[in-house]
A protein has these predicted regions:
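Cytochrome P450 I-helix active-site segment
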Residues: 8-18, 119, 123, 171-175, ...
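Cytochrome P450 catalytic-core helices
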Residues: 264-283, 287-289, 402-418
Length: 450
């Protein structure tokens, strides 16, 4: 890695010989990044598995994610053999022209008017969850939100399949996800080649998902009538040259969507319940909204997100304080200069941390305070666009963002209309930065029927 002549490295904290900042980062990922940015400014030089820059200037973030995104790809760890083993050649691992071609193919399936068709699926899954809740019961709301969001994703992907098939699919997805978390936590480059029990379980789950998907593809290709589930849309999708995807490519996309389709919004909902429990005024505003929007309508049924701006603002503020995706990592493919003036040598890792940016007092006054009004239209327009990016931006913007918002608002409104959730005693809630940001030991809450 060669530094352009006449340029100096950005400032950063002192590093240990050989291991750099890795021990400090692994010991307290969120705190280390926040402290580094607070002490050393908008471009911080770190040593975490090589030269790394932590960026906290919105213009620099826009540069990496949008303006020069072709120069900043995901890490080889994700795009290499380890990532490909888990996601295949799906959208999350594709790069360059391959990514653009695949995104253009998939985007129509996620247009707002298309995903609106899944409002009934969301309502049915939310109602099924709420029928299992009872006055006075204590639940782990994190488990509940993960479960309902995963059920919705499975139904949206494979809506034509039987409940038994959907249950097998969901179980396999969970097994694969646990193994992925183990791989991403490990610093050992060869751990995915060890013949462990979890590796065998992963392999079985991988084949189960592909088997279910391949059988579903065959039925949909042979069917005389059209279906509107996502798998059917993938089967019908065409590239610009008129060609469709192979069965293998569709399987790769299903594996990608089966994980990415539920975790972000499940974590956002979990943290939203936690935050609402600590703010009676915001809780009352949500109740007023959901009661008014549903006046004269059945307790169960489809929720209209347009009638629930407070629910959307609560979720947005939840993702500000506790962003499900807490860190993006990119790698510079060529030498570059950021808008802030910092020179970036080829091969430099770039850290963009939602945890750090979303709590920056320059853009969010009293940043640790829960205040959904930050996401009223006038407040949004008053701050830089790239001070807040829970779903990413540019060509890597989460393709399922609209689906996530529809799920989140619908589940929050449906549950808030029927129950009040309060924190169960005897807990210390600590955010754990894993693949997503989650409560370390779950989140137990007591239900009170409204």
């Amino acid at each position: 890695m060669n530094r352009p002549a006449g340029t100096a490295e950005p400032p950063g904290p002192p590093a240990l010989p050989l291991v750099g900042h890795a021990p400090a980062f692994l010991r307290d990922k969120l705190g280390f990044l926040a402290r580094s940015a607070a002490e050393y400014g908008d471009v911080v030089r770190l040593r975490i598995g090589g030269s790394t820059y932590l960026l906290t200037d919105p213009d620099d973030i826009k540069h990496v994610l949008v303006s020069k995104s072709d120069n900043y790809e995901k890490t080889p760890r994700l795009n290499g053999l380890r990532g490909r083993r888990f996601f295949g050649s799906g959208l999350v691992t594709a790069v360059g022209a391959e990514h653009l071609r695949q995104r253009r193919m998939l985007q129509p399936a996620f247009h707002r008017e298309v995903i609106a068709r899944f409002a009934g699926v969301i309502a049915e899954c939310a109602d099924a969850m709420l029928r299992g809740w009872s006055d006075g019961a204590v639940i782990d709301v994190h488990d509940e939100m993960l479960d309902v969001a995963q059920r919705i994703t499975a139904r949206a992907l494979l809506g034509e399949e039987s409940d038994a098939v959907l249950d097998r699919f969901r179980a396999a997805v969970l097994t694969r996800r646990r193994y992925q978390e183990q791989l991403l936590r490990s610093i050992l480059p060869f751990i995915d080649r060890l013949p462990t029990r979890t590796a065998r379980e992963y392999s079985q789950a991988h084949h189960e998902i592909d088997r279910i998907t391949t059988e579903g593809i065959a039925r949909r290709r042979a069917a005389a009538t059209r279906s509107d589930d996502l798998l059917s849309m993938l089967v019908r999708a065409r590239y610009d040259d008129g060609q469709g995807m192979s069965d293998d490519q569709i399987c790769d996309e299903v594996r990608t969507l089966s994980v990415g389709g539920y975790e972000t919004i499940a974590e956002a909902l979990t943290w939203a319940w936690y935050l609402l429990a600590g703010d009676p005024d915001v809780e009352a505003a949500v109740w007023k909204e959901v009661d008014g929007a549903a006046a004269g309508e059945p307790v169960t049924g489809v929720v209209d997100p347009a009638k629930h701006p407070w629910c959307r603002m609560v979720l947005a503020e939840s993702m500000r304080l506790y962003p499900p995706t807490w860190l993006f990592v990119r790698v510079a493919q060529r030498d570059d200069v950021l808008p802030s003036g910092a020179a970036v040598p080829s091969g430099t890792k770039i850290y963009l941390s939602q945890w750090v940016m979303h709590r920056d007092a320059r853009y969010f006054a009293d940043p640790d305070r829960f205040d959904p009004r930050r996401f009223a239209a006038d407040a949004i327009s008053a701050r830089p666009r790239f001070a807040y990016f829970p779903f990413g931006a540019g060509r890597r913007l989460c393709i399922g963002e609209e689906f996530a918002w529809m799920q989140g608002v619908s589940i929050l409104a449906s549950a808030a209309r029927r129950f009040r959730l309060t924190l169960a005693p005897g807990q210390t809630i600590v955010p754990e930065p894993n693949v997503t940001l989650r409560p370390r030991k779950g989140l137990r809450m007591q239900l009170a029927r409204r």
